[in-house]
Swiss-Prot record:
Zinc phosphodiesterase, which displays some tRNA 3'-processing endonuclease activity. Probably involved in tRNA maturation, by removing a 3'-trailer from precursor tRNA. It catalyses: Endonucleolytic cleavage of RNA, removing extra 3' nucleotides from tRNA precursor, generating 3' termini of tRNAs. A 3'-hydroxy group is left at the tRNA terminus and a 5'-phosphoryl group is left at the trailer molecule. The active site is at 65 (proton acceptor). Homodimer. Keywords: Endonuclease, Hydrolase, Metal-binding, Nuclease, tRNA processing, Zinc. This is Ribonuclease Z. Zn(2+) 2 binds at residues 65-66, 176, 240. Its EC number is 3.1.26.11. Its cofactor is Zn(2+). Pfam families: Lactamase_B_2 (PF12706). Binds 2 Zn(2+) ions. GO terms for molecular function: 3'-tRNA processing endoribonuclease activity; metal ion binding.
Length: 280
């Protein structure tokens, strides 16, 4: 069984009810944080997960709304890990990830220096193990395997999706993308597909061109559902709603997805959980 928790279902626009894009995946006793938008650690704390308990951080792409709390994750893990010789935090993302992590740590160098000067048991900066990938296997530990494939969020490039497999259960996390062959291949036969969705029918009516531009490189509800149908997944989990999902409108979103996908559709607020089982 794999458990998926939508930690943050919001967008770049601050929302009092939704944290920034982030998803927690638990499998085989391991805890994977996929993206780290604003407020991610508060949401993780609500389900009993702290930064020190993360097995790895997986980044789909380097847009600010998906990495906005990277510094908080790095520093909080560092100061809340009390074992000697802590294991470096594995961080897996597309090319550019190493530069982002290094720049983030550099920006926090004063804070890091203050803490090292103050605490005798903090004698080195936060330890990280950054690996950049665009395709293929990236993780294989205690029965949990993860592989990535390229997605299409151009002009943001490269971008990747993740597939987590454990004891016959499988979950794919698409990140931000339009329909593409890489995601179709990655999601083929998966138990669940976690996919960003936008309501293009609503966004297209906004007068500001900058906001209309987001239609160019995100999937609509119908497009995400069509991807799920092509791939033959069991469940479509919608997240990163643009505009924000309003209470009472859930059935509108479900109806749009149902035009293309006959399977189970999950959507909801932050902390919504979905259990993905192996086929019986």
């Amino acid at each position: 069984m794999i458990e998926v928790t939508l930690l943050g279902t919001g967008s770049p626009i601050p929302d009092p009810n939704r944290a920034g894009p982030s998803t927690l995946v638990r499998a085989g006793g391991q805890v994977f944080l996929v993206d780290c938008g604003r407020g991610v650690l508060q949401r993780a704390a609500a389900v009993g997960v702290g930064a020190a308990g993360l097995s790895t951080l997986l980044l789909t792409h380097l847009h600010s709304d998906h990495v906005g709390d990277l510094g908080d994750v790095l520093i909080t893990r560092w100061v809340s890990t009390f074992t000697p010789d802590p294991v470096p935090l594995p961080i897996i993302g597309p090319p550019g990830t190493a530069e982002l992590v290094a720049a983030t740590l550099n920006a926090l160098r004063h804070d890091i220096g203050y803490r090292i000067a103050h605490h005798a048991d903090l004698n080195a900066p936060p330890a990280v193990d950054v690996r950049e990938h665009t395709d293929g296997p990236v993780w294989d530990r205690d029965g949990v395997s993860i592989r990535v494939a390229p997605t299409d969020h151009r002009p943001v490039a490269p971008t990747i999706g993740f597939r987590v497999d454990y004891q016959g259960a499988s979950v794919v996390l698409a990140g931000d993308t339009v329909p593409c062959a890489g995601l179709d291949e990655l999601a083929a036969g998966a138990g669940a597909l976690v996919h960003t969705v936008i309501r293009k029918d609503i966004v297209a009516t906004i007068p500001q061109q900058r906001l209309q531009d987001i239609c160019d490189y995100h999937s609509s509800v119908e497009q995400a559902a069509a991807t799920a149908a092509r791939a033959g997944v069991g469940t479509l989990v919608m997240t990163h709603y643009v505009p924000a999902l309003v209470a009472g409108q859930e059935e509108q979103w479900r109806a749009l997805a149902a035009r293309e996908f006959a399977g189970r559709v999950e959507l909801g607020d932050d902390l919504h959980r979905v259990q993905v089982d192996a086929p019986s």
